[in-house]
């Protein structure tokens, strides 16, 4: 198996292992994070109804203006602050953090820390 295929398999294993344990409820929805090479996305999801309550990403102009590159730690911090602001507007204060199989390092950690600093608790 090629190194890239091994990396994808390892990511999928981490993702399914974490997802089996984490479930978002109406009282405490799930903060899901996805990162690509160019962008980072965050959603707050209620798994009981299967709906996305709040979302933010670097694709949106509000988070990406005055950034040269949207796939870095600074962009992740902005998305974290934006998701926290939008969640608090909808009276969502506590969430369950779902790193989606990504290692808790770099952009994922920056987004989580920024969301905590701006009022979300998890």
Swiss-Prot record:
InterPro entries: Ribosomal_uL18_bac-type, Ribosomal_uL18_bac/euk
Signal sequence range: none
Cellular component GO terms held in the UniProt record: cytosolic large ribosomal subunit
UniProtKB keywords: Ribonucleoprotein, Ribosomal protein, RNA-binding, rRNA-binding
GO biological process entries: translation
GO molecular function, one term: 5S rRNA binding
Tagged with keyword Zinc: no
Family: Belongs to the universal ribosomal protein uL18 family.
Assembly and oligomerization: Part of the 50S ribosomal subunit; part of the 5S rRNA/L5/L18/L25 subcomplex. Contacts the 5S and 23S rRNAs.
Chain's role: This is one of the proteins that bind and probably mediate the attachment of the 5S RNA into the large ribosomal subunit, where it forms part of the central protuberance.
Name used for this protein in its record: Large ribosomal subunit protein uL18
Source organism of this protein record: Geobacter sulfurreducens (strain ATCC 51573 / DSM 12127 / PCA)
């Amino acid at each position: 198996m090629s190194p890239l295929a091994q990396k994808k398999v390892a990511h999928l294993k981490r993702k399914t292992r974490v997802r089996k344990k984490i479930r978002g409820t109406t009282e405490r929805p799930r903060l899901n994070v996805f990162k690509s090479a160019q962008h980072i996305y965050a959603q707050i999801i209620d798994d009981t109804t299967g709906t996305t309550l709040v979302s933010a990403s670097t694709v949106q102009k509000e988070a990406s203006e005055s950034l040269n590159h949207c796939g870095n730690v600074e962009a992740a911090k902005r998305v974290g602050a934006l998701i926290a602001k939008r969640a608090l507007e909808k009276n969502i204060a506590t969430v369950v953090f779902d790193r989606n199989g990504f290692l808790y390092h770099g952009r994922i950690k920056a987004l989580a820390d920024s969301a905590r600093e701006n009022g979300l608790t998890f």
